[in-house]
Structures are given as structure tokens and as C-alpha cells.
Amino acid sequence: MKRLGIFFFYEKNGDVDDFITYYLRDLARNLTELIVVCNGKLSKQGRAAFEEFTDQIIVRENKGLDVWAYKTALDHYGWQRLSEFDEVVMTNSTLMGPVRPLKEMFDAMAERTNLDFWGLTIHHGAEGNPFKGKHLYNYLPVHIQSHFIVYRKKFIQSKELQNYWDTMPMIESYTDSVQRYESVFTKQFADKGYQWDVYVNTDDLKEFTDYPLLVCPTRLLRDKKCPLFKRRSFMHDFEAYLNDTAGEPVRELYAYLRDHTDYPLELIWKNMIRTMHPYDFTRNLGLTRLIPERVQDEASAAAVRNNRRIALCMHLYFMDMLPQSCAFAANMPPETDVFISTNTPEKKQQIEEAFRTLPLHAVTVKVVENRGRDVAAFLCDLAPQIREYDYACFMHDKKAIQTKPGSVGASFGYVCNENICKNADYVLNVLTEFEKDPYLGLLCPPFPTHGVYFMNMCSNGWGPNFDNTKALMKKLGIDRPISGEKMPIAPFGSVFWFRVKALAPLFDHGWQHEDFPPEPLPQDGTISHAIERIYPFVAQGAGYYPAQAMSADYAVARCDSMQAYAGGLIRPLARVFDCTTFGSAAASAGAFAARRHWFGFGNYGPYENSKRRRARNWLRKRMPKSAYENMMRVKRTVLGPHDVNYED
């Protein structure tokens, strides 16, 4: 069979990951010719990767999405040349695999001689139009999904298909692509009498889900011999999964790929770490570590102690907390080298005396400049001493003295220490996590949610620090996904474990204490707060990913507290909004909040957005104090907030 393949590719930097060449290597065995169409850039590496399979590579302006990429290839060949092929396959880089030879699929479908066009999988449609804008049918028809669709010769030669593509309007958005092409193509040509079908029959799943390849991919791979799966599975909004599942689809998919196929899992990891936000893939894959309190693997624990260099970095300032700091260090393996910074010779002497009796390999205490606090001490003074180590932990004697009541700050310290260094066995289990997972770069405690820290969930943990973190990433040359709508998997509180190689790009910057503001240090929005949030992105840039670690005790408390938060919010919301599902509740409440904000009556807390805070700071610096306070008093009287503590 003479078969042409059209492969559409887009990646913002034009780099071609190995999962694509793995897919093309099998696909090409079933093709006579292959043409690749790239929207936007194609790097030197990317071109070399595609040239393994074809010399027909078109790089075009990034417009029209996949639809116009396919149209470009069709126009390049022309209908006369296209009519010489028995089949034209159109597919793209949104698919991963195969987990079984594609030849099985092509051979099976070759026997279906009655078909004019066919595909891999089907979307079962929806009663209404889930997209904004006008839809051809005002509902979502059953349709072949556009990630893999095949035209047969008779269909290619038809005037209806040729006219369809010749008159295809420019596609302006993803929604436009779905509504003008993917969701309507199948019905349009079925209504004209053309025959179609898909390789993966999911008629039995119509009542189960409208999108089987995303919602139950394991069933399709295991039970229906589907050879491919969606890359999007790993970066799909976890909240969207919760509308139809308990969050298990991607975890089941990964387990099946790991245990029942020979698909190279490193192809998934490398692409995830390079191109996806860890907030998405760590939740979809369930990468949060529940660390046991007793050693689970004696052999692995012994291997870490014998074969890896382990360091503990500590910045100690509060001498009344020295006993707690010693207890923290005492949980480290005896082979650990400890590097401590403090700000006075007197404190140095106290620390050396307190640590003298601890069973540790070596303890080095250094007096450093008292500027930039723990973050500056870590980057300027401690990090240069651990560059040759394998794994390290950083902690400081955290005392959130600005937080009232004091119990709130003390509990923040509990969250950090409980989940990073609960006991000696716990620490060994943490270290074996790094040994077992070559892509793990950072383990940090969960972000605190109690007391005033509840607003972490309101601002996705950014507060006024998104713009300064993004600017710091650019300064350091780190190009990884970052979004103000997604929480960084970061060590809030600056207590965490890390693979030293994972933070090398940050250590290489050559930090000086002058890079940090002098005392009194602002409560938020500084370079230190940006660094606190940039750790996970640095790790990603180095080829690793961040994750959270929790003790079993804390995980139970966390689960209970989240249920308490959810119940406390949902009960009053349900009196006003549609709370049938999480999605409906979020959508209706979000729409209401957006309307209030649009008309000037909204308030999203002290960290609503950094632009507003910067504007207030700009005014505060330039106006007389009394004038500024009067202006803000009028603003609060008219627009609010009226009943919450709010920093103007």
C-alpha cells in the first residue's frame, strides 16, 4: 500500500524530544513517504531529528494551528499527487507511543475496504456546546479525534474533500480549531454518505465517558489494543479529572506502561520535566512522597550511607532555638557533614559547643554577614562548600515572629520539620527516594494552610512574588513553564532536601550578600522570596523535578484539614451556586467573583496581584503619609474590603 504520512509538530523552541522520534520510527515503517510540518521554530537539533526520517520538512509561521499545518502539506503536494496514494495519514506530536507495533492497526484497518476515512480513537460528543462561540451544530457531534486520521484514495479524489480543504478559513484559536474542524469534520462527511470508523472501538464506553483516551487510557491500551496514548494526560488540569474520576487515570496509565509494556519511561520523564509545569504532572502522577517513619529498605539505606556524600546546611540565628536545631541535626546519618552559618563569633562558639557531642562526621561553623538572612547565607556561604556532595538538606531555625498569634508561626515550623526530618529512619527513607528515582531533584514540605497561611491557596503560593520570580528565572537563563495560576512546588519556609546537581545552576550564579536587601527585610516581595520559589524551576532546568514529602501523621492531618476547608467553603457556597461537581462550583463561584471584581467591588485578599501591590507601594513612597492614609481610607470606605484585615 502506498501511504503518505503528514506529521504536524509544534514546540515553542523547536526542539524535538525523543518520544517523537520513537513514534516516528515505528510510524515510518508503515509509510511510503513522510512530510513534517512545523509551526514556528525548528531548532538545529529538531531538524536533525526529523531528517532521520525525511528530507521533506516545512517550517511555517505559527498560525492556523494543526489545521493549517495539515492544509500546508496538502497544498504542497496538490490533489493530483495526493491521489496517487492509497492512504494519507495525518497525525501529530500530541500522541505518545506506540506500546505495540502500529502495523497491527494498519493491517487490521486495511481489511476494512468499505471505509473512506478512519482514525485511531473517537470522542463520543456532548449534548451542548462546551466551547464559547458559535458551533456549526450547537452541540458536540461524535467525531474522530484529529490527532490521528487517515484518508483513503477515493476520498482524497472526491471534490467534496478537496473543496473542504481549499476553502478552509484561517484558524485563530484552539476553540476555533475544534469548532471548525475536529468536532465537525466526521459528521459533515458522514452526512454526505462517506463511510468512517476508528480502530479503537469504544462503543461500550459511551455511558462511561465521552473522551475514553483521556479518562480511561489504561482500558484502551490493555483491553482494546490501542497503540498510542495522549501526552496531554500528564499535563491535563487535575481539577478537570476530578469532574469525572477520583484522580486515578494517569497513575493507572503510568503503572500499566511501567509494568506491562516495554515503552521507555524516560521518554515521558524527559518531556514532562522539560515542557510541563510540575504542579500538573506531580498531581496527575501522584508524586507526593508519603515517607515511612521506619526504614523500609535496609539495603538501600546502607548503600546511601556508604556510597553517597550527604550534607546538612544550617543557618542558625536564634540561640533559644539551639536545642531544637541540635535535635534536627541528630537525625542525620552519622556520615553527614554539617555546615552551619551564624552571624556572631559568640553564637559560633555556642553552636560548636552544642554540636560537639552529636554523632556526625564533621561540623563546620562559619560567621557570615548578617544580610539576606537564611537565603543569603545558604547561597553565598554554605552552598559553595557542598558542590561535591550528592544529597543535601537545608534548614534554619525558623521563627515567624511577625505572625500572630505565635502558635501560627510555631506550627509553620512544625510543618517544615515534621515532613523533612521527623526522625533518623525517616531521613534514611528520604535519601532512598533520591536513590530510587533518578529524576527526583527536590523534596520539600507541603505549603502551610493554617491560620493566615490559608491565603497561600488564594494566591497559589505566589503572593506578590510572581513577577520577581519570573524576572529571576530570565536572569538565570531558566526556560521552564511558570504560571501565576499554578502553585510552585517550592519549599515555603526554606527547609528542604535536594540533589546537589539539581540546584547547580542557582549555585553557579555567584551570589553575594549585596544582592540581598539590608535589614529591616521587607515582609514579602524580596529577592529572597523569589529564590524560595525558584528552587523547583532551577531543578527542572537541570533535568529534575520537585515533589512534596509528608510523614504519615502529617498526611492524616493534612487530609482532615483539607476536608474541613472544603466543607467550610462548600456549605455556604451551595446555598447560592451550583455545587453538583467541583467543576460547576468553581465555575459558578469564579464567574460571580469576576463580575464583582469587574465592577470594582471585588477583593481577593492582600495578595490579589503584584501589580496592584506595586501600585500601592509606588504611591506610598511618593505621597505624604497623611495624604496616602486618607486616600486609602476613602478607598476602603467606598470599595472595601470592610470586614477583613488588609494591608494597604
Predicted features along the sequence, with ranges:
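ER/Golgi luminal nucleotide-sugar-dependent glycosyltransferases, focusing on the catalytic module
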Residues: M1-D648
